[in-house]
């Protein structure tokens, strides 16, 4: 373990912020389904909550209601995704249940050199993710 830390520290020491510009690529997403919600920290919480509620209720006319939705959160947005799922469950009077899965997602960063004398680099890092299934329960 100590060997990994030392070698990683030397790589970090070579990456001077004056010499390289960090460009974070977008995370890889699976093909989007109509009932997938990707939560982020830029969009208003109430708007994201309303969008989830609208999918579950089927809009203003009650058409095309989804029996389940999947809420995805990455990194800092994990807490917001959990909060949205719990708010939906609390407002449903017991008709909705949640099931959560966690995972680790590999993210790729590009390091673009400021000068032509250096080559561009890529760096892979890991980030936590959560995938919450919110579904209707059939009354017994």
UniProtKB/Swiss-Prot annotation:
Q: What is this protein called?
A: Ribonuclease P protein subunit p20
Cite the InterPro entries for this sequence. Answer: Alba-like_dom_sf, Pop7/Rpp20
> What Gene3D superfamilies would the database entry show?
Alba-like domain (3.30.110.20)
One GO BP on record is:
tRNA 5'-leader removal
UniProt GO cellular component terms: cytoplasm; multimeric ribonuclease P complex; nucleolar ribonuclease P complex; nucleolus; nucleus; ribonuclease MRP complex
Family of this protein: Belongs to the histone-like Alba family.
Native source species: Bos taurus
Pfam families according to UniProt: Rpp20
General function of this protein: Component of ribonuclease P, a ribonucleoprotein complex that generates mature tRNA molecules by cleaving their 5'-ends. Also a component of the MRP ribonuclease complex, which cleaves pre-rRNA sequences.
Q: Which GO terms describe its molecular function?
A: ribonuclease P activity; ribonuclease P RNA binding
Q: How does it assemble?
A: Component of nuclear RNase P and RNase MRP complexes. RNase P consists of a catalytic RNA moiety and 10 different protein chains; POP1, POP4, POP5, POP7, RPP14, RPP21, RPP25, RPP30, RPP38 and RPP40. Within the RNase P complex, POP1, POP7 and RPP25 form the 'finger' subcomplex, POP5, RPP14, RPP40 and homodimeric RPP30 form the 'palm' subcomplex, and RPP21, POP4 and RPP38 form the 'wrist' subcomplex. All subunits of the RNase P complex interact with the catalytic RNA. Several subunits of RNase P are also part of the RNase MRP complex.
- Which keywords label this protein? Cytoplasm, Nucleus, rRNA processing, tRNA processing
Q: Which domain of life is it from?
A: Eukaryota
The gene behind this protein is POP7
Q: SUPFAM superfamilies this protein is in?
A: AlbA-like (SSF82704)
Subcellular compartments? Nucleus, Nucleolus; Cytoplasm; Cytoplasmic granule
């Amino acid at each position: 373990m100590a060997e990994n830390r030392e070698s990683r520290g030397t790589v970090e020491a070579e990456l001077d912020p004056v010499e390289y510009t960090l460009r974070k690529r977008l995370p890889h997403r699976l093909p989007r389904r109509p009932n997938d919600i990707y939560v982020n920290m830029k969009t208003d919480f109430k708007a994201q909550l309303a969008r989830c509620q609208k999918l579950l209720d089927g809009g203003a006319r009650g058409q095309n209601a989804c029996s389940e939705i999947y809420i995805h959160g990455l990194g800092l947005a994990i807490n917001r995704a959990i909060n949205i799922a719990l708010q939906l469950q609390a407002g449903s009077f017991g008709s909705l249940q949640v099931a959560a899965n966690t995972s680790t997602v590999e993210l790729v960063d590009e390091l673009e050199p400021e000068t032509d004398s250096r080559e561009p680099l890529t760096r892979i890092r890991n980030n936590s993710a959560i995938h919450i299934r919110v579904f209707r329960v059939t009354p017994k």
